[in-house]
Amino acid sequence: MKNDHSVVVANLNGDRNIIRVNIGGAYNIYNAIGCAAALTAFGIDEKTVIDAIEHFNGAFGRMEHFKAGDNTVNLILVKNPAGFSQTMNFLKNIDDDFTLILSLNDNAADGRDISWIWDVDFAGIFEKANVKEIYVTGKRCYDMAVRVKYEGVGNREIKIIENEDYNKLVDIATSQGRDAYIVPTYTSMMAMRPVIAKRLGGKDFWE
């Protein structure tokens, strides 16, 4: 598994196939192989199935990458404890230094009740020294800061980006000399992504 893709071996109809999945994360492997199994069961030929998987790219905000000089700003949407936990597990397996930015909103599309953040398994991510800086933002940034503090972050400071200042977020993400991983809830992602795309280049929504 790499940050931006995985190469897996899948047995389809008894044949061993090496397949590239163009999105990082173990859960995206599960999704791809689940789709392959379903399509194969419906009688779609292996070549068509494999070709479809290898030419698929994620939608905006889902493991999306923006280049910032020699570094990358990564946007990973989360919507519930399961997806958030899988994202933390993915980040735990990154060896290079990075900046982590968590963004929590409580708009209707996010869910008004944010107690679900206490069900997130952070997978011991803050035990790793390569998580160099931690920022939180969004309408409920202080709630996220409390959640992260209770998880335990060692001697790191949890820094707040107030007022949903996404230009400041981009400034921070691009000025650290390392990759940044931004983990927002849905409406936060929808608000910040146009700012990131305008500053760093990227397709408009739905393209």
Residue ranges and their predicted role:
Residues 15-17, 26-28, 109, 141:
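Generic "edge-of-domain/loop-turn" microfeature
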Residues 17-21, 66:
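Generic detection of short hydrophobic beta-strand segments and adjacent strand-loop junctions
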Residues 20-57:
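A conserved, hydrophobic alpha-helical segment in the catalytic core
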Residues 6-9, 21-22, 58-60, 116-117:
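Short hydrophobic/aromatic-rich motifs at helix boundaries and adjacent loops
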Residues 1-18:
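Extended acidic/charged loop-beta regions that coordinate divalent cations
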Residues 40-44, 51-60, 65-207:
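ATP-dependent carboxylate-amine ligase
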